[in-house]
Amino acid sequence: MNKTADPILTIFTPAYNRAHTLPRTYESLCRQSCKDFIWLIVDDGSADNTAELVRDWQSRDNGFTIQYIYKENGGMHTAHNVAYANIHTELNTCIDSDDMLADGAVEKILRKWDEVKGKGCAGIVGLDADFDGKIIGKGFPDGLSETTISGY
């Protein structure tokens, strides 16, 4: 997929003193085959070197835009609220500060959205997996490809 002038996907990451784990998240975003997204990091009052790390990444040619917002510590839910108030793209997803995005995920998200956005869908849902690709928690029921929130 080609990069557009105005990405439709924001990947947001709430972070609090996570300079030791954020590089894994950053590296997974750099490995994406499609860089048509914005990475929004909401720093929830970190006292470590999170800000310096992000400033360094912002100065690099990563192929995607990195936005950084610092706020006073208030908990992850307040970081989510700040993220949602600052997201201006059609789609968004949250990647925690100690997680990584699977290779090719952005391309899959955007392709799937192209397939379903005209069908009255509000979004798409994926599952979390561990580093070996094993689904964390309960997977979707066999044969489920589309549903409504009330139908699940």
Task: Report residues per predicted region.
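Nucleotide-sugar donor-binding/catalytic module of glycosyltransferases
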Residues: 1-152
